[in-house]
Every structure is written in structure tokens, then in C-alpha cells.
Curated annotation (Swiss-Prot):
InterPro entries: Helicase_SF3_DNA-vir, P-loop_NTPase, Parvovirus_NS1_C, Parvovirus_NS1_helicase, Parvovirus_NS1_N, PV_NS1-NUC. The keyword Transcription regulation applies. ATP binds at G400, P401, A402, S403, T404, G405, K406, S407. The active site is at Y212. This is Initiator protein NS1. Gene3D superfamilies: 3.40.1310.20, P-loop containing nucleotide triphosphate hydrolases (3.40.50.300). Coiled coil: none annotated. It comes from Canine parvovirus type 2 (isolate Dog/United States/CPV-N/1978). The gene is NS1. It comes from the Viruses. Residues 1-277 are annotated as: DNA-binding.
Amino acid sequence: MSGNQYTEEVMEGVNWLKKHAENEAFSFVFKCDNVQLNGKDVRWNNYTKPIQNEELTSLIRGAQTAMDQTEEEEMDWESEVDSLAKKQVQTFDALIKKCLFEVFVSKNIEPNECVWFIQHEWGKDQGWHCHVLLHSKNLQQATGKWLRRQMNMYWSRWLVTLCSVNLTPTEKIKLREIAEDSEWVTILTYRHKQTKKDYVKMVHFGNMIAYYFLTKKKIVHMTKESGYFLSTDSGWKFNFMKYQDRQIVSTLYTEQMKPETVETTVTTAQETKRGRIQTKKEVSIKCTLRDLVSKRVTSPEDWMMLQPDSYIEMMAQPGGENLLKNTLEICTLTLARTKTAFELILEKADNTKLTNFDLANSRTCQIFRMHGWNWIKVCHAIACVLNRQGGKRNTVLFHGPASTGKSIIAQAIAQAVGNVGCYNAANVNFPFNDCTNKNLIWIEEAGNFGQQVNQFKAICSGQTIRIDQKGKGSKQIEPTPVIMTTNENITIVRIGCEERPEHTQPIRDRMLNIKLVCKLPGDFGLVDKEEWPLICAWLVKHGYESTMANYTHHWGKVPEWDENWAEPKIQEGINSPGCKDLETQAASNPQSQDQVLTPLTPDVVDLALEPWSTPDTPIAETANQQSNQLGVTHKDVQASPTWSEIEADLRAIFTSEQLEEDFRDDLD
């Protein structure tokens, strides 16, 4: 049917229910049991004592009008339902509304801010009872039990006031105690599986009315069937609505609120078992943990800076300090098991800066260039170790004199990783207490291993071992790359006053040996925190993957203790940045200037005036041929001019007579 075939009253009822369909409401039930006090029977319909209260009288009159208007001719209401029961229902309706109003006053809530629905029913077993749905934005789920106690108190007080049975003061007090102790006002609750406690259960206001209350029949024979007497609500939609219209409202609401598509899922027998209900605290901790892992939080200080709200929330809970510690431990464990140190560094790279990034001029590579090394090869080897691809050689060792750049490189790598554990030499019994669940172990200023040499060898080779922790049991250290700096020769192990040479070669087999001997100038500065992420991104972009297979493909073999980092040399073109630096250094060197002014011998004049050899062979091609033989690719070297092009440029500027005259002057 189309909407215009229904009455305006029906459509208003449907729209009102749809408006409050998803509003969460409390579900109360009022009842009045039959009791006996000192031989006096007090039945459910003995609460009609007249009282001089205009507000209560007005409410009773309104309920009477609603009941009279909704009576249908085919139902002989007057003959089947006695007038005493009818009058009692009207009185109860007024009392329940009075209780609601008194609760609103106690909570400083305006009545027009609340939505409520009341329906009086008769059950074969329960007898008379009344359902009350209450919704308000100012009422939270936690206040449900308090509301029940308040309504129970007001309900028992009004029942004693309107009881028509002649009771003594003591019996009135007893009646009120029975009403409160027996909970003549109840609220819908559910029992938690784990805590075994009852918690208030909220219902959807509109759905509950349409699917449950409006589908019930109107009571005709109190002794033969169950049904409803009267319904009232805050919107005045169902106070005067007939039974047939109520059925239409329920049907229309059900059709309009039906989902467009019905999703079907197939569950196994195991999945049919109801899972454990998670508490709000568990859900909050899981959400916090996901945020910490996504933001790579590995220390309490990082947590305070990046997630202060969740930190304060957990700290304020009972046992908050232990909760913080355990949550942070789960976060670091997740990072240590799912990410490598190289991956943590790589994800911090700013791709917008990678385009203009010059690897040769980075501070780390400047230190390597001072030693005449192939800086790409050194960075590639370090990246393989950080990615747990170094095999048994799981440790990067920076050693040499002071002020050569060992610590600033190690510090930059550790800061880029984030989840780093430090070796504590001062803690003799538990030196590796901070090294569990980490992506990198940093050993600063390592000395003689002594009694701990076997533990060092196991950790430096990437083995899984168990270590003792202070105040705890033993804990497992998974394969973790190590970065170590020292001024001493750590391959010499002394236990007491005795040297143990049998440990020298095993220690060397576990180290990526990088010996720095060139002292840095005082204004060299620190390595920028963005440098190593860009170095790793540069290596990946140019095909230097952090695997040992890729390393051997480029450099011919795996690194050794006495690895020659200067070979193969990087061949730079004339226009490359490296050559410009060399030219600048040569111009500022007095010795190189004296060599330029050295007189030329006569055979040099003839050599300069003759055509140069291999006129069609580019310099860059010759360099590339040499580099390809060594397994090195130079993608950043700019194209250099050929010898013939250089000769043509020189001869265009200087004639042969001018060149000969200049050379003669120098010889004289």
C-alpha cells in the first residue's frame, strides 16, 4: 500500500518510532504483589484510596480518558474487566508518571528532554505489571541501578499512601520494606560470563516498542488470557490509538526498517560457540597498542610525547605503572619480531629529499672518503648486517683512535632504528638486561670481554640465547644485529691476567671490521638524523638490496675481517662532484701548484702538438669498462667528453704557434 492510504495518526506514530529507533533506553518493570500482613490481605487492586492531590488527580483523569476512547464496541470491556481493576490501572499509571517526574527533579533533568513509553499489561502468571522505557541524553548506562533504587523508593512510598486497607503504622512500614526489599521495580540486566555480575542492558527505544509492545493484544478476559490495558507515551502518539492501528504501525515500521540486503555467512561448528565478551578496558588497551606500534613508540618518553592521553589514562588506573610497562613491552616485542633494523630505518626516509640527495657528500660517506674507501661498498655491507642478512657476521665494529667518527655514525644508526637496547658494562651480573625485544643492540666503548666472552660471541653471531635478568627469570634474545664502537683491540681476550688467543679468530669471524683512523676536524658536527634513512633509500633505489646475495653480486665476495674497503675504486668523471672537490683541494695545495709550474722538456712539446691517441673513445666508457669488470655500476657519474673533443677545444683556443711559444718560454 502507498503511504496516503493510512490515517494521519498511524503515519505520525511510525515517524515518531523511526525518529527514536536507535535511541538507547532503560527498560523498567513495575509490579505490585499480593501480600498478607497480620492476617490482612493486601491485593494488587487495593491501592485506590482517595487523596487530595490535584496533580495526581489530573493524571488519573487523563488515563481514564485514554482507556475510554480506545475501547472497541466488539469488546465488552465493562462486563469482562471489572471497574475496580480499570480504576486501579488508571491510578497506577498516574503513580508511575509521578515517580518518573520525581526522578527527573532529583537529577535536574527537564521532563521535555526525556522520551518515555508506558504500557500496563496483565499476565497469567505475573498478574498486573507495567513496562516503562526511558531515554534521555542526560542519563548514562552507569546510572541505571541508581534510577531503579530511586523509583523503587518512590513507588513503595506512594503505594503505602494510597493503600485502601486499614493498616497500622507498623504494618505500613512493613509493607514499604517488602516493596523495597522484594524489588517491586526492576531494570533489565545481563550477567557477565567472567565477572558473574549483573550489568544494566540498554534497549533500542523505537525497535522495542514496534517489535514487542505494539504486537500484543488488548486484554479482554483477565482470567483467560494476557494482554495490555493501556499505553501512554511522551509524544502522545499511542495514548488514544486503537488496537488495529497499533498493528498497522508495527507492520509499517518493520517493513521500512528492514535492511535492503541480507548478508549470509557460513560458520563452522567451532565458530558457532559464542566467543568471550571483551571488556571495555581490554578494547581500550588493544586500541592503544595498535596506535603505539603504528607510531613506533619504544620508550615511556616517546609515549608521553606522542600519545599523552592514553598514557595518562593508563597511569590513572589501579596498577597503572605495571600496565604501562607491560603494554610497552608488547609493543617492542611486536616491532622486534615483525621488523628488522633496516626496515625501521628505511620507512623514515623522506622521498621528497631523495631526488636531490648526494650520497658522496653525506657526513657518513665523507668520513669513509677520508680513508680512500668505496663508500657505497661500506654502506651496503652495513645495510646487510642491519637487515639480518650478514649471516654469522652479525656485528658492525667501528674501532680506531678517538675523534675519528665512530660514535657519531653508531649514534645516527641507533637513533634511526629507535628500538635499541644498550649493553651496560657497569652491571657485571646482568650486562644485557636492556637488550631483549630490540631491533638493534648498541655496545658503546667496548672493552675486554673477559668472563662474558661466550655470551658476546653468541650475541654477535646472531644466535638465539637466553640471558638472566635482574629480578626476573631468564629471557630469550632473538637474532639481533649489533653495532659496536671501541678504542681497544677487542679480539684480545684476557681472563684475569691470562690471554686467551683461542677467542681471537672466532671474534673476527663475527665482526664487520671498519677501522677509522682519520681524525675529524673540530667543526665536523654530528650526523643528521635524516641521513641514514636517506642512505638506505638511496641504496634500494640504485639496486643495492640489503641481502648478502646482492652484495656478492656487486662486490664479488662476502666481507671479511681484513676487507679492503678501498677496492674496487669508484671511477668519477671529470664533471663529477668528487673531481670538483679534488680540484679545489689541488688548487689550495702549494705543492700541487709548484708541480704545475715545473718546466716542460722538449719531448713534451712534441707530444702536446701531436694528435692524441684514441680520439673516439670516451673517458666515461673506459671508466665504465673498468668498473664493470669489478662489479660496480656508476649511475650517478655524468657523461665525460672524449679525448678528441678536449683536443678540439684546446686547439680552438690556442694555435700551434702560441702553444709552441709558450712551451719555449717555459723551457728557457
